[in-house]
């Protein structure tokens, strides 16, 4: 059975306040995106890796790979107008049957245990996402103000979100709507239940300068 990691990296670094897109920023002397690809290659050296990048960033990425001697084999697909369209472009390169894990390119600290958990469960469950507990108090905004809600009723969603390849391709044949905030929401729109597994709290999404400081501390 074929395993594929589809790494989506379309950020422009606006929230980071940097001219360099966040996926290319260095942590410990190595670009974030390289560390992300390494995590999946470490889990399964035979895994197909597809990187989705805006076309205008692809030459720079190749230069970075040459500069760092980065030789993990991967295919590159063009980023789309939205994350939905980027994933759809990447899926066009997926070979054969099996499972596909879609992962944010700026989440380099996903653990090997979480990757394994998601990919192994997806063989049986067909649709699996990692989540972590909400540890802060949560308030719901209302027209009259706000109210406390039970944090036990909520989870924070991470990636990789892993699905049966055929199921995922069919899901992405649906027409795009703004309600598709992640891959699980696309699959759920077909009436398919999504199974939750435990994520790892270190699996942060690096989007701000503070996140970059945390990432450096995690090395």
Curated annotation (Swiss-Prot):
State the EC number(s): 2.7.7.60
Pathway, per Swiss-Prot/TrEMBL? Isoprenoid biosynthesis; isopentenyl diphosphate biosynthesis via DXP pathway; isopentenyl diphosphate from 1-deoxy-D-xylulose 5-phosphate: step 2/6
SUPFAM superfamilies recorded for this chain?
A: Nucleotide-diphospho-sugar transferases (SSF53448)
The record's section on CDD domains has: CDP-ME_synthetase (cd02516)
Which InterPro entries does the entry link to?
IspD, IspD/TarI, IspD/TarI_cytidylyltransf_bact, Nucleotide-diphossugar_trans
Q: What is a GO molecular function of this protein?
A: 2-C-methyl-D-erythritol 4-phosphate cytidylyltransferase activity
A GO BP annotation? isopentenyl diphosphate biosynthetic process, methylerythritol 4-phosphate pathway
For the protein in the UniProt heading, the enzyme class is transferase
Identify the HAMAP family for this entry: IspD (MF_00108)
Put simply, this protein is called 2-C-methyl-D-erythritol 4-phosphate cytidylyltransferase
This chain's source organism reads: Bacteroides fragilis (strain ATCC 25285 / DSM 2151 / CCUG 4856 / JCM 11019 / LMG 10263 / NCTC 9343 / Onslow / VPI 2553 / EN-2)
The organism's taxonomic lineage, starting at the top: Bacteria, Pseudomonadati, Bacteroidota, Bacteroidia, Bacteroidales
């Amino acid at each position: 059975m074929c395993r594929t990691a589809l790494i989506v990296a379309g950020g422009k670094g606006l929230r980071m306040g940097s001219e360099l897109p966040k996926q290319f920023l260095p942590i410990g002397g190595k670009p974030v995106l390289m560390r992300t690809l390494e995590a999946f290659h470490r889990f399964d050296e035979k895994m197909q890796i597809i990187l989705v990048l805006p076309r205008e960033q692809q030459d720079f990425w190749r230069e970075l790979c040459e500069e760092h001697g980065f030789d993990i084999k991967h295919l590159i697909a063009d980023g789309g107008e939205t994350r939905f369209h980027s994933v759809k472009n990447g899926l066009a390169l997926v070979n054969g049957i099996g499972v596909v894990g879609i992962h944010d390119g700026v989440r380099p600290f996903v653990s090997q245990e979480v990757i394994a958990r998601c990919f192994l469960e997806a063989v049986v469950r067909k649709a699996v996402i990692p989540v972590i507990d909400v540890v802060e108090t949560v308030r719901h905004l209302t027209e009259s103000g706000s109210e406390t809600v039970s944090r036990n009723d909520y989870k924070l969603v991470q990636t990789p979100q892993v699905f049966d390849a055929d199921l995922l391709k069919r899901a992405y044949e649906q027409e795009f709507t703004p309600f598709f905030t992640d891959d699980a929401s696309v699959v759920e729109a077909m009436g398919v239940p999504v199974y939750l597994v435990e994520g790892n709290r270190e699996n942060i999404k690096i989007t701000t300068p503070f996140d970059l400081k945390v990432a450096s501390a995690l090395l």
